[in-house]
Every structure is written in structure tokens, then in C-alpha cells.
Amino acid sequence: MEGPEIQFAEATIDNGRFGTRTVRFETGRLAKQAAGAVLATLDEDTVVLSTTAAGKHPKEQFDFFPLTVDVEERQYAAGKIPGSFFRREGRPSTEAILACRLIDRPLRPLFVKGLRNEVQVVETILAIHPDDSYDVLAINAASASTQISGLPFSGPVGGVRVALIDGTWVGFPRYSEKERAVFDMVVAGRVVGDDVAITMVEAEATDNAWELIKGEGAGAPTEEVVAEGLEAAKPFIRALCEAQAALASRAAKEVQVFPVFPEYEPDAYDAVEQQVADHLDAALRIADKQERESRLDEIKDAAVGALQAGFDGREKELSAAYRALTKKFIRRHILTDSFRIDGRGLKDIRPLTAEVEVLPRVHGSALFERGETQILGVTTLNMLKMEQQLDTLSPVSRKRYMHNYNFPPYSTGETGRVGSPKRREIGHGALAERALVPVLPARDEFPYAIRQVSEALSSNGSTSMGSVCASTLSMLNAGVPLRAPVAGIAMGLVSDEVDGETRYATLTDILGAEDAFGDMDFKVAGTREFVTAIQLDTKLDGIPASVLAGALSQAREARLHILDVMAEAIDTPDEMAATAPRVITVQVPVDKIGEVIGPKGKMINQIQDDTGADISIEDDGTVFIGATDGPSAEAARQAINAIANPHMPEVGERFVGTVVKTTSFGAFVSLTPGKDGLLHISQIRRLVGGKRVENVEDVLGVGQKVQVEIAEIDPRGKLSLHAVVEETPADDAPAEASTATADA
């Protein structure tokens, strides 16, 4: 779009031999009544409209910043009509919810502290190229629209996806290019002086990583390689931030004055500190969470009660001041004494326990505990037709591994709403899913849909990484042949000025309190050989990449220790549970698919009815057969092979066949699907000791089993049968050849 009222700026992402990508930020044409509106375009094909608006009046009753990020996926962006009953977009997809979290996390820390006006950022996907994703473009669009909105925002922030493709970190990779990638990483950051400080990371090894690493010799995404990726993202982030800043210099509104509500005034802090300092310091050395929190609540209640008279109507300030003092003490102990509230050193891990097969009947189960964090993992297997069907803007249309995470309120000893998952639960489930996807067996190697559920039964730090560990154990217990076990650990960071210099302390296996009062939540999952998933959230304006590289190395030590503990519980896949379905495959020629299905599905339905198996056929001729037991699945496979991979019957072969039709001169007997023969009335007499048979129906009825032998095959391939009288027909046996040559 061009016009006198339109301002724009562009950023060029130079990927060398992989070409360039152009990101354009434009404002002045659309959504003019929003406080800030930016149209972001990637290579003129993918278009996202970002708007930022602020409420006119502050929400004084809130003790948090009410920022909301919404992503509106429009199916017309991809030339689609929604598949819902009303043919209209409804509730946001999982991908949209994850994109909301991806945008919220780097933006939230950059607003002025104490802001209580509602701020809403809405991302509308207007057009999308089928080979591109919109989420990273939306991060930049959200930053740009907020930067020009007149809100107190210390941006801009730039976001880029980099993928490690054939040894090169490529910015804004296409889906087709990522098929050759071993690692995919979204990095957000802001320019600080001559450097770029990292504010958010979301990364994972790709679905194809294992094949590329083990089969084609691609480099594994080790901690050192991932650290290189963070550095590789910096020039791209700088270019995006500079383009946003250039747009803001020409189009930004003047920053408005918004009321800021500090959590407490200095006099409240001083009074609380004088009242509780000694008691608080002692309470923070109690290792047990419940006991410690009970004692902290007692101290707070006593302090508020004692000071209430002098701070009438300011009780919230006293509580906030007490929380700030608690934070100060915890951080001071860590930075100066290397002491943590539960008595551990900075690199120590809480006690670990791992157990499998903890539930009856289910296909796989495990219980993983790390300190007071307890996760129950449960695995369910089924046929591939039960995999999740996706109706999204991405080219991915199905998902066979589904990871659901539940965080009930009782896990923290509280009450609350239960039911449909919240955004946090969806995000945690997606993180655990990404950590495990790279080690799943291939579809043809393990043709099952897998649903993994993580139940957070008790929480005191990093239930998402506990879910990764419990899921690995549970899937091995279910018989899933994982390529390697995966474990996860949450790292924390505390930073402050000590003796005139900024000091950083990295914590291994953080508690809930260390997450709340620290500066970073850095989750790392992986195998013994490489990293499979990363998630970084920070409350700072940014963290030096060198600090993150050190945290990655420290996380690896912890991960290896956890994997050792898990291996003591289970280190190889168990036998599949008796309650799990059995799925086998058979390959049929593509031109035989129609014969297997039959007219109007008659043949495949007959096989399913006869054997009790479920059958699904892929376009390439792969047939998946699922049944509650092995014999049923094998019977279905034999029936399919008899149609699609037949052999010519031979004289002398014996079968237990099924009568499918009777006539005045005999009975037609089905030997295998599609292969019938005539048992003449003269042969039927042998079944009754040679007595005369007036009506065939008096001896044989449709559906009855009878053992026969092929007596003759005429030139047209028609079969004449003889009755076998020396053996009793097996009424409940499936139609199958009684000699080895009759097996199909």
C-alpha cells in the first residue's frame, strides 16, 4: 500500500545461500482508531495486522498488569472456508493460543512497572503463504504497534525464528526448508547498547532431527550448537528492531501519562522490614515448603496486624512490602552466600524418584517425583485413524502424538476452577510434546496414535519438565520404542548489583518461590546426546547470551543425573499391555486398493465384521489393521492378502470354508475372500454317511463352516470341492488354508 498518510520501514534478513526475506512494517492506512496499528508483511505474501489499544481508566483493584494478547486466525487468509458446522471461525486453535503466549512473554516485561490500565494487543492474520508461519511475524507486529501507540513501553523487541539447516542458521525458514533442519528456535530480544539482550526463547529439535543426525550425519543440536544459534539470531533481531525504531521515529504518538500504582510506598517497606527482618530470615531457612509457607504466613499476619493502625486502608501495601522483603532476602542469600531456601547449593537437585506401572488397565503409566513436585504420566495407544485432525493455517493436517497437561488447583493445596484447559496448561503440554517428538519412532515403525496425559498432582517448581520425565517413563512402560529417553530440568537466574558489578547466579532445579522471585525460568529438555526443547521466560529487559550459554551447560549436568535415575526404573520398552490394541500393517498394490475396499465398502466391511478388526488404508497402499488381540489382526491380514496379494490355489489344498449360497445341485463355499468353490450334492452326501440328500439345506446352511479339499480347477479357474469327512469342521475357526501353502 502507498499513500501520503502511510509510513513504512523494512528489515532485510540475509540468509546467504538460502536467500533473503523482507519484513515490512506499515502504518497509517488500516485501523486508524486504534492507539497503534501496524501491518506487517513477510515477502509480500504473509500479512498480519496488529493493533494495540489501552483502557481509559486504570483497574486500581488489580495487583497485576492487565495485558491481553489475542490472535485471530482468519481461514480466508489461506483461501479456506472454516470446517465447522456454521462455517465460521470459533474459539482459538491451539496454534493461536501458543502464538498468544509467544507474543505476550517478550512484551510484558517491557511495560512500565505499576501500569494498571487494560492493554489489549490483537493480531489478525489477513493472508498467509502456505510455506510460512505467522507467529514470529506477529511478535514483531505486536511490538511495532505497541511502540507507536503512546504507551509507556521500553521496546522495540524483535523476534526471529532460526533453524539449523545443513549446518547454517537460517532466519525466517520456510516449512519446506525446515524438512532439512535439525533444530528450530524462536528468539526474541532487544538492542541494548552494542549488544542484543535475549528476552524469550522457544526451541525444539525437529521431527526429522533423529534421521538427519543418525542417518545423514548432520550435526546434533548440543548445548554449544544451541548457544551458537542464539548468537546467530542477534543480527536478525537487530535489523528488525532498527526497522521498528525507524517507523516509530516517523509515526509514533507522544507517550501519554498513565497513572502508575506502586505496590507500596517506602514508609510501608521500612516499617515491615523493621518488624519482621529477623523472623523472616529464619523462616526462609525452613526446607519443607508447607511448613515454610505456613510460618511465612504467620509472620505476615502478625506484621500486618501490628502495623495496621499506622497504615489504615493501606493493608495491601503492607502485604506487598512483605513480599518484596521476602524476595530481597531470598536473592541476597543466593548471590552472597550461594544459599537457597531449602538448603541446597546452586547446582543441587532435589531428591528424585521414578516408578512405572503404577495404574492397572491403562496401557502405560509412571510416577515421577522431584522434591515436592509429583507428576503422573499415562499413555494410551490406538490406531492411527485416532490421530488428531487439524484445521489450521499451517500445512500440518494431522498429529499422531498428543500431549495433554493438567494442573488442578489441589496440586498447590488450593481451591479453584477445574475443567477445560487454560492457556498455561496448553502451553505446558505443548512444551512437553515438543521435547518428546524428536525421539518418537517413525509411523511405519510404530503405527499407533499416542495420547500422553500428564497429571500435575503436586507442584513446587517445573511441573512441565517433570511431565517430560514422567512421559518418557510412561511411554517406555507402554511399549513405545523411543529412540532415546528424554529428561528435563528448570534453571533459574538471580542477578543484582554486588560491589558495583552485575552478578549472575544460575540455579539448577528451581522451586516455585525461586521462579516467582527470580529473574528467569529457563527450561531445558534433551537426551544424553542433544537438546530437544528449550523455553526461556525472563522478567528482565534481557539476558546476555553468554549467561544463557552457561545455564545450558549447567542444565546438561542435571539432565544426565536425572536420566540415570530414570534408567533405574526402566531403560528399555516393556512388552505392550494386554489391554492395548494390536496394530499391524500390510502393503498392497495401489491398483488393488479398490478390490480390498469392494463396491460401496462391501469387502472391507465384511472383513471387519468377520474378524472384529479395524482397518484403514492409506493412499500409498499401506493398510493398518488394529484389533484387541493378535489373532484377530492376523486373520484380517490374511483376508486382505488373499484379495490383494493372492496365490493360485492348488489341487489337494484343504480349507475350512463358509457356505455362502445353496442350490439344488450343491453349495458354494467361500475359501478366502473373493475365492469360492462348488461342493456338489454328491459330495454333500458324504457328510451324512452317504445317505441320499433331497435338499441341500437339510445338511448345510448359509454361514455354516465345512472342511473341504480342492479336487479340480477347470481352465476358467473354477474350483470343484470334495468334502473332508475324516475331520470335524471347526465351527468357530476363520476361513483359512489348512496347509502352509494356503496361507496368504
UniProtKB/Swiss-Prot annotation:
Involved in mRNA degradation. Catalyzes the phosphorolysis of single-stranded polyribonucleotides processively in the 3'- to 5'-direction. It is found in: Cytoplasm. HAMAP family: PNPase. It catalyses: RNA(n+1) + phosphate = RNA(n) + a ribonucleoside 5'-diphosphate. Its cofactor is Mg(2+). GO terms for molecular function: 3'-5'-RNA exonuclease activity; magnesium ion binding; polyribonucleotide nucleotidyltransferase activity; RNA binding. Its EC number is 2.7.7.8. Residues 581-640 form the KH domain. Belongs to the polyribonucleotide nucleotidyltransferase family. GO terms for cellular component: cytosol. Disulfide bonds: none annotated. Residues 652-724 form the S1 motif domain. One of its GO terms (biological process) is RNA processing. SMART domains: KH, S1. SUPFAM superfamilies: Eukaryotic type KH-domain (KH-domain type I) (SSF54791), Nucleic acid-binding proteins (SSF50249), Polynucleotide phosphorylase/guanosine pentaphosphate synthase (PNPase/GPSI), domain 3 (SSF46915), Ribonuclease PH domain 2-like (SSF55666), Ribosomal protein S5 domain 2-like (SSF54211). InterPro entries: ExoRNase_PH_dom1, ExoRNase_PH_dom2_sf, GPSI/PNP, KH_dom, KH_dom_type_1, KH_dom_type_1_sf, NA-bd_OB-fold, PNPase. Mg(2+) binds at residues 515, 521. This is Polyribonucleotide nucleotidyltransferase.
